[in-house]
Every structure is written in C-alpha cells, then in structure tokens.
From Swiss-Prot:
It comes from the Eukaryota. The keyword Chloroplast applies. The chain crosses the membrane at residues 116-136, 200-220. One of its GO terms (molecular function) is antiporter activity. GO terms for cellular component: chloroplast inner membrane. Belongs to the CemA family. The gene is cemA. One of its GO terms (biological process) is potassium ion transport. This is Potassium/proton antiporter CemA. Contributes to K(+)/H(+) antiport activity by supporting proton efflux to control proton extrusion and homeostasis in chloroplasts in a light-dependent manner to modulate photosynthesis. Prevents excessive induction of non-photochemical quenching (NPQ) under continuous-light conditions. Indirectly promotes efficient inorganic carbon uptake into chloroplasts. Its main location: plastid. The lineage of its organism: Eukaryota, Viridiplantae, Streptophyta, Embryophyta, Tracheophyta. It comes from Chloranthus spicatus. It is a multi-pass membrane protein. Keywords: Antiport, Chloroplast, Hydrogen ion transport, Ion transport, Membrane, Plastid, Plastid inner membrane, Potassium, Potassium transport, Transmembrane, Transmembrane helix, Transport. It catalyses: K(+)(in) + H(+)(out) = K(+)(out) + H(+)(in).
C-alpha cells in the first residue's frame, strides 16, 4: 500500500505542468478569432455596404442612428431659420455639411453592424475551441487540476482566508455593483442587445446578494469540514475588516 502511494506520488511529481496546454487554452481562441476577423473583414464589410437592408440589426443601432438623424433634422431647421439673414454661399456650405454628416452616419451604422457580426462569430469560435479542449484534453485537464489543488493545499491558512475575502469582496462585496454594471453593459454591447438601465439595476441589486449568501454558505461548509482553524482565521479577518 505504501509502495503504491509512493509510486503515485513519484508519478505525480514527475509529470510536468502542462504550460503549453494552458497557454494554448488562453491564446489559441484569441489568435483564431483575430485571424478570422482579419481574413473575413473585407468580405463582410463589402457585403454589408452593398446589401440594401430595410431593418436595423438591433435596437442599439436603431437608437443611435435615430439620435443622429434628429441632430441632422435640427440642422435642417436651423437652415430654414437663418437663410434669410445669410448669403447663399453659407447655406450651400451648410447643406454640404449635412450631406457629409449623413454619409458619416451611414458609415458608423455599417461599422456597428460589422462589429456585432464579428463579435458573435468570434464568441462562437472561442466557445467551440474551449469545448473541444474540454472534450479532447481530459488528461491535461486532470494534470492541471491536480497541480492547482496541490498549490492551494500548500498555501497557509492565513493566505487562504485573505484570498477568499479578497475574491468575495471584489466579485460580490460592497464595491462589486460597479463592476457588475460594467460587465453586463459590455456583454450587452458585444451581443447587440438593447441597453436597459432598469434590467441592469435590478440584476445588480439582487444577484450579488444571492451570490454572496450562496458563496458564504459553501465556503463555511467546505472550510469547516477541511480546516476548522481556517474558519476561525477567516472570521477574525472578516470582523477586523468590517
């Protein structure tokens, strides 16, 4: 029995940490997504510019475009007001400016259209690659998991308690709502959803509370079973910070 444990330990120690596998998980989806964007960006841009579409891709583009058209309409009304007091050359320059603004508005609309298409495509590619890694790289994931568990096990109880408090305060603590708002806003922008302040505010005000309670329960249950001394250190540090 002892020989088996010793052989298993020696095998674990002799197994190298899969740094290439870890680097490929992080860099390969990004590299493939970037290559996809560079290769297909001219084709998608040409397709979007030549395609006559009667509908907007999403509510965000529609809202932004309507705001710009309102600005152009205000310029047109201003033109009617001041044309009696200024010469025709000034009116002509104003019309040229309105024409340029309209062209620029169409370009911005097409760029937003292309951006959302590329974001959706790259997200799908990244998800597919990571899913393939999780299915095909079981052995590498097992080795990586064993190294992470060993690293966490070798940490002192004080460092573990401090890390838990730091993680919970950043993700679900008092200052976390600002981070949640930025993250949800970025997700909305990437996937082309309409920005809804009421939904974001309701989510930020409720979800971190439930998540905080759930995490504290899991942490207390796990630490109380694994290391009761760590629970004492965690409570003492938490009381001092509060």
């Amino acid at each position: 029995m002892k020989r088996a444990k010793k052989a298993k330990k020696e095998k674990k120690e002799s197994t190298p940490l899969p740094f290439p596998y870890l680097a490929s998980i992080v860099l390969l989806p990004w590299w493939i997504s970037l290559s996809f964007k560079k290769c297909f960006e001219p084709w998608v841009t040409h397709w979007c510019n030549t395609r006559q579409s009667k509908f907007f891709l999403n509510d965000i583009q529609e809202k932004g475009t309507l705001e710009r058209f309102i600005e152009l309409e205000e310029l047109f009304l201003l033109d009617k007001i001041i044309k009696e007091y200024y010469p025709d050359t000034h009116i002509q320059r104003l019309w040229i400016r309105i024409h340029k603004e309209t062209i620029q508005l169409v370009k911005i609309h097409n760029e937003d259209h292309n951006h959302i298409i590329f974001c959706l495509s790259t997200n799908i590619i990244s998800f597919t690659i990571l899913s393939g890694y999780s299915i095909l790289g079981n052995e590498e994931l097992f080795i990586l998991n064993s190294w992470v568990q060993e690293f966490l096990y070798n940490l002192s109880d004080t460092i573990k308690a401090f890390s838990i408090l730091l993680f919970t305060d950043l993700c679900i603590g008092f200052h976390s709502p600002h981070g949640w708002e930025l993250m949800i806003g970025s997700i909305y922008k990437i996937f082309g959803f309409a920005h809804n302040d009421q939904v974001i505010s309701g989510f930020v005000s409720t979800f971190p509370v439930f998540l905080d309670t759930f995490f504290k329960y899991l942490i207390f249950r796990h630490l109380n079973r694994v290391s009761p001394s760590l629970v004492v250190i965690y409570d003492s540090i938490n009381e001092e910070l509060i």
